[in-house]
Structure formats: structure tokens, C-alpha cells
């Protein structure tokens, strides 16, 4: 069969076929699509059922045997062979922006806590786990991030088939339960069980529907819409460290975490109400439990995605860049205090990086949609982050003024990593496959994240300046490798030419 990404209705195409020793011939053919169940948000289209007809006779063509095929739609210039039909997406309106607001509220705790790990790590390393080594403590946060990304695979296929509401409710209960349990933790295994496993699992389950619902409402403005929704992570990263620092002193660790848990629970309830997909998926019921199991196993991890070079290098690039980002954010406060700054200054630096990150999400997202393109912006910002690590943090981290400048510039340049990664994935994917592809990327990221923080903790060791410099070099190299992978993916898609992409 000829596999065409999107054909909304029957159209007339002119195909030029050049295969083997046959002469070039023009065939006036009609493409039809049979209506059938779909796994996502183009419910009336099934690419596998596309049929070529010539002179009212069905023509069965093997797409692998066709070369030099060109096509044009006759008398329908608005139709195009692209992954998604932009006429299906509102790209605005009250309902669409309420979904963005709902995703924003949900990402305040989900991404906000990831951006605030330093506020928790720096406290427990000096109190509950004061006698535990940095490399051991790092496993708490490494496993939290790994489980967060790994559990995305549980929600990707489910979201494509069933929508968001079940995932939102389940993720909210698990996430909030883990945070409430965190308040009573005193040993490493308790922190791992409550925070790493429970809250991490809830984070991963929530991540896909919060990002995915926005993708079902926007196409042309998807970059800016996703950037606005992920600003919730920056808001959480601003508020949570300041709030925790104050509450640690006034009410202690237990009630500080409980108050944080109530705030996160409220935000997630709001998100569950507002963040809904545009249309309910139209799916074919499963005939047996074996079919259910087979489908979910195949949707959890589809290794065939990695056969696409453009997808493979986006996945690797995102994994390297986000692992570097979370590792640096986790140890930034501890590094600042090692350099002689007070705890107040260290926590304020975390807040400052997240505050500037708001601009780092919005401005790149705007330029990505309007002028430069999503991949181009992602390459520029990731490269800037690596450069700032090498030329500011590494040689001049002991100078408080330079460190402040670095924190602000780094916060801006890394702001788009979390916001534009799903947009770049969506740009090379059909919306019907977005959940599974997004989850597959984060499966790879989980595998990368598991060793990154422990390696960082081992490099830091006793916390000397020389040890931290080794840590900085390691994370800078990861960030640079992430930029290189995005460049390779872009080259696979459009080559070396300068264009909006």
C-alpha cells in the first residue's frame, strides 16, 4: 500500500512513476481513505487503508518499490502532504487557552519540583543525611528523575488511546502521596521509597498528558503555547525554594514539605479539570485481554522509532541536554555554599535562574514559531548553555558577581530545553503518535539520567573546588553533545541549508 501521512478526503493526484526498467508514465489516480478507528486525534484517518485507484480499478502498490514519486493535489491547493492538517487545530480560542492554563497549573508542581531539587538536596545533606556521602545522596535524586522519565512510557500509549483524565487522576494521587510521605523520611531508603519511587512515578504519569493535551489544540502556535504552559515549571522553581527556605526555619522540614504537598495537590486538581484533549480518541475495542497486553507492550517501547535518524538524534540530544540541566540545577546551591556564599544567597540563585527561565521559555518559543524554527532555536540555546558553562562557571565560579551573571544567563539559555523538546518531537511526528514518541524519548532519557547524578556526586566527592570543576566539565560536555545531536537531526531533515526549521 502507498502510505500517505494525511489525506483528509478523496483527492486527485498526478503520480510520476519511475521503477526498474519501465519508462516514466503519468498516472491520473484517485486516493481514497476508508473511515476506521484510529489511536489518536485524526479519528477518521487510517494511513494503512489508503488505496490507489486507476480507471475505477484498485491498484495495489508497494511503497518500497516506488522511486522518484512526485505528487500534487489538483484543484485543492490548500491540501498538503504533511503530518497534520492545520485546519483541524484551533490554534487559539478560549477553550484552547484554558487547556494551556490547566497545563501551566499542573506543571507548576511537576516541573517546578524538578527545578527545586537543589532546595531539598542542600537541606537533607546537612540534616537528616549529614553523615551520608554525596554520591549516596545523589541516588535519591537520580532515581527520582529516572523514574519520572521512565514512567512516561506507561502514560504515552494510554494517552494516545484513552485521553488524559485517567492519567491525571492516577498521577495526582501517587504524586501527592509520595510528597506527603517525604515529610516523615529520615533515612536514605525512606527517601528513595517516598520521593524517588512514589513522587517520581506520579511525575512521569502526569508529564505526558499535561504536555500532550496542549499539542492537540495547537499546531502553528504549538511552540509558544507549550512554552507558556511550561512556564509553570519556572514559577514553581521560583516559589518553592524561597518558600521552603522560609518554612524550614519557621515550622521545620516536616510541615514545610506538607505545606508544599497541599499546594501541589491544589494545582494538580485544577489541571485535571482544565487540561483536556481537543477530541476524544476514536478507537477499536480490544477483543481479548491478550490483545490489550500486546498493544500496551508495543506502545510502551517502539524500537522502530529509533530507526528514523532524525528521531534517534533528537532523543539522544534531549537526553544529554536535560540530564545536564537537572544535574547542574541539583548541585548549584551546594556549589554556591562551597564557594563561600550563604545559604540565603545559594537558594536565591536557584530562584533567580528559574525567574530568568520564564523569559527563556517565552522568548525562544515566540521566535521559534514566528521566525527561526524550533530546531534552530533549540540548537542555539543548548549551545549557549554549554558555552556559559565553559567560559563563565568553570573559570570564574569563585567570583560572586560572575556567578550571579552565569546563573541568569544559564537560566535563560536552558529555559527552552524543557519547553521546546516536546515541540521538536511533535514537529517530526504525527499528533496521533505524539504520546508514544514523547514517552519513548523519556525512556531513553531515564536510562541516561540514572548514572549521570551518581557520576556527578562521585566527581564532587568531598566537595572541594577542584572536584566541582571536574563536575562542571562533565556536565558541560553533556550539554555540548546534546547540541551536536540536534544539529545532526536537523541535517537529516533539511540538510545544511539555512532555513526556518
UniProtKB/Swiss-Prot annotation:
Primary location recorded for the protein, binned into one broad class: membrane
CC per GO annotation: cell periphery; fungal-type vacuole membrane; plasma membrane
SUPFAM superfamilies attached to this UniProt entry: MFS general substrate transporter
Assigned protein family: Belongs to the major facilitator superfamily. Monocarboxylate porter (TC 2.A.1.13) family.
Name the UniProt record assigns to this protein: Probable transporter MCH4
GO terms under biological process: riboflavin transport
Residue stretches spanning the membrane: 98-120, 135-157, 164-183, 188-210, 223-245, 255-274, 311-333, 343-365, 372-394, 404-426, 439-461, 471-493
The encoding gene: MCH4
Membrane topology qualifier: Multi-pass membrane protein
Covalent cross-link (Glycyl lysine isopeptide (Lys-Gly) (interchain with G-Cter in ubiquitin)), residues: 54
